[in-house]
Amino acid sequence: MRYPKGSIQLNQSRDLPLLRQILRSEFVTHSQLFEFTQLNHYERSRNSFHWRMRRLVDRGLVLRQTLVAGTGDAVYSVASSAATLLQSMGEYCLVGCGRTDAEKANRNVLHAIGLNEIQLSALRAGLLVRWMGSMEIRSQNELTAFGFAKDYDAIVTVRTDIGERRFALEYERTPKAAKCYRAIAACMSQEVHVNRLLYLVANYDILRFVSGFFTKAVYPVFFGLLTDWHSYLLEMPVLDVLTKRAFPLKQALNGATPKAEAMPTATSHRLPFH
């Protein structure tokens, strides 16, 4: 079968998974995207991956930003035409809201890349069951009557030693204004779809600042360092601001009561409580 000059036939098992991953990530580096294809088993050859990406960029389905500050790598996002195509095939996205235009969202690039790394760490360890990204969350919140209390960065389902556990995730690379955290703390009592919120933050100062707004929260909110997630995953220490105690994340997810005894060696360092 012949196709019009300049057209592209999308491969169901290779091209479409690539486009879906870029859409769900919103922004993703070249190296991150290749690792996603490896871990999700839909591309094995690096040369084939390079060829496929050049093809998608050349046909205008993928937008490429070269050497975005702070990444040292090319960064991809989907073009509006590709997002519309994926939406027609059942993907959750809000094409009409301008959220797929790279030109309008450069400030979110590093945030999205950081979220990709959080997801990849769980994938590498075989812990990730499902990652519901911000685009799918926004779609559910804006288009249905059963939305979450806020637009989280992700809803994450992981495997623990006693079963699957789900939690909302917020990644704070830089702090927001105080009024934003007050609003978040106020709305969390309305959350009915997920029963844990984890804040991963870039450093101790942000942890102290953000956690201070949740000291009276009834809803379970935990705080931890991004570096600890990448090093220890479910064994990472998290802070419960209500008890002012640190304990392993898996204990928080499993609903166990914090104990006074020392944590395992990998998580024995202290988090700031005050």
Residue ranges of model-derived segments:
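Nuclease-adjacent, charged terminal/linker segments that flank catalytic cores
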Residues: M1-C97, D101-A102, P272-H274
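Active-site metal-binding core of divalent-cation-utilizing nuclease and nuclease-like domains
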Residues: Q65, A105-L110, Q119-F167, R173-A177
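A generic fold-level signal
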Residues: S13, T71, I113, G147-A149
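Soluble or luminal CAZymes and related metallo-dependent hydrolases
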Residues: S48, L110-G114, C180
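Non-catalytic C-terminal interaction segments of nucleic acid-processing enzymes
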Residues: L16-L19, I162, P175, K179-A183, ...
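Hydrophobic, Leu/Ile/Phe/Ala-enriched alpha-helical segments that form helix-helix packing faces
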Residues: T37, M53, V57, L86, ...
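Structural motif
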Residues: E26, G60, G126, V192-N195
